[in-house]
Design a protein with these regions (language model features):
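Mature catalytic domains of secreted/periplasmic carbohydrate-active enzymes
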Residues: 1-166
Length: 166
C-alpha cells in the first residue's frame, strides 16, 4: 500500500525510529497488528456518509472491506480469502523482519476459524526468527492460541469465563 508513513507523511520510518530509540534506552520494542480486522471492519464505514466508499482497490489504505454479519462469530461468512490472509501473513512477517519486536500484540478476530492456519504459520515463523534474538511473546485475545502458549489479553480486569491455573 502507498498509505504508509514513508510515502504519505511524515516521510520517515516511524517504527524504525522507535526501534533505534528503544534500543538506545535499553527498552524492549513491541508492536501491534489489527490488520486482520480489515476484512470487514471498514465495511461499516459504507453504512453512512463517510470517506470509505466502494470501489476500493488493493493498495488503498485498507483492504476492500466485506460485509460482516456477525464479527463475534468464529465461522462467520464471508470467510476471508486466501489472498487476504496471505497478505495479512506477509505483512506480519514484514514487521518481524524489519523491526524484530520482542512483543507482538494481536487484537481480536485472529481467532476466526479461517485465520487459524495462517496464525499458526506466523507464530512458527516469529518464534523461529526471534529465537536467536532472545525470544519473543505473542499477546492475543480470546482463544486464538491454546492457553499457556502466549500471553492472553485480559481486558476489564478478568476473563469472561474460568481458565485453568498454570
Amino acid at each position: 500500500s502507498h498509505w504508509n508513513a514513508a510515502e504519505m507523511g511524515p516521510h520517515r520510518d516511524i517504527m524504525g525510529d522507535l526501534l533505534v530509540e528503544a534500543e538506545r534506552a535499553g527498552m524492549t520494542l513491541g508492536a501491534s497488528s489489527h490488520r486482520v480486522e480489515h476484512w470487514w471492519f471498514l465495511g461499516h464505514g459504507q453504512e453512512f456518509d463517510s470517506d470509505i466508499k466502494q470501489p476500493m482497490h488493493l493498495g488503498d489504505y485498507a483492504w476492500p472491506a466485506m460485509p460482516e454479519r456477525e464479527n463475534q462469530d468464529l465461522f462467520s461468512e464471508p470467510m476471508p480469502t486466501d489472498e487476504f490472509l496471505t497478505d495479512w501473513l506477509l505483512r506480519c512477517c514484514e514487521i518481524v523482519d524489519r523491526y524484530h519486536p520482542r512483543i507482538l500484540y494481536f487484537d481480536w478476530w485472529i481467532q476466526h476459524s479461517a485465520v487459524k492456519p495462517y496464525l499458526q504459520r506466523f507464530a512458527a515463523y516469529y518464534f523461529n526468527v526471534m529465537e536467536s534474538r532472545g525470544g519473543c511473546v505473542i499477546n492475543y485475545k480470546h482463544d486464538a492460541f491454546p492457553f499457556g502458549s502466549g500471553v492472553p489479553d485480559i481486558e476489564r480486569g478478568q476473563f469472561a469465563e474460568a481458565k485453568p491455573f498454570l
